[in-house]
Amino acid sequence: MVQGSCHCGAVQWRCQAIPDSAEACNCTICRRYGVLWAYGFEGEGISVSGATQSYIPRRTEFHFCFACGCVAYWREREPGPKGRRRIAVNLRLAEPEAVAQIPIDRVVGLDDTFKHLPRDGRCITDYWF
């Protein structure tokens, strides 16, 4: 299990299992937010709590803490064809030692292809210095 919270602790998330990877995306939103995402489906091993404010650019809702402004998670606005709603939590809100060895998957989101690049051996600890 791994968990994280915003700076003030009002918004929290929990993953029942250690994520297999963290995603670093270079799209205009993720790059500016400086996030590392762990993906799953709402109610299926990932839970979130606390009041948030959201920004809804298209099909996703980016959720921030009302008090401190930390980006906590995003989720799809509507469930997919199988009735499941995709969600991603910001692993940068976890304690560093809890997520240090999770490998990074790099994604090209800037051109909207969301193509995965080959792994280069880096993990979260390499992104935090």
Located regions from the model:
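A short Gly-Trp-Pro
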Residues: M1-S5, A10-F129
